[in-house]
Amino acid sequence: MKEGADVKHKDTKKECEELWAKNKYYVLSKSHKVYLDIREYLKEKEVDILSLHEKIQKVRDIKESKKDFSNAILHVWGYFKKEASEIEKQGLFNILEEYMEGKNNQESVIKYINTLLKKYPNKYLQESTLLTGEQNETMA
């Protein structure tokens, strides 16, 4: 009986890790604090997919934070920085600065990142709900 429970636990843990992988940059873009809270939750011995789903869903109601969004974009940029040209880098930093100054919106920044993603494919980022805009589809 215990062995079956261990397998189920591993499956649940794996499901949670997959769900988190898809949503972590979205969560980070909304709240660094919630991002850290969820990371701590996932270190627990027992995790629950529905509980994780709820935690992720709750960030949808959090008011936009330019600082947290910018932080998430800089994390995502880390996947491109070795391949992208200086012009592409400057393009991102310019559009991000304009966003911080209120001259454009998150969609503009995400659109630019998605342009880089087409040029420099990355399966992990291609499944990120921050970049796909599929925040309603947070189940793994």
Kindly give the residue locations of the regions a language model identified.
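Acidic, Ser/Pro/Thr-rich low-complexity regulatory regions
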Residues: 1-140
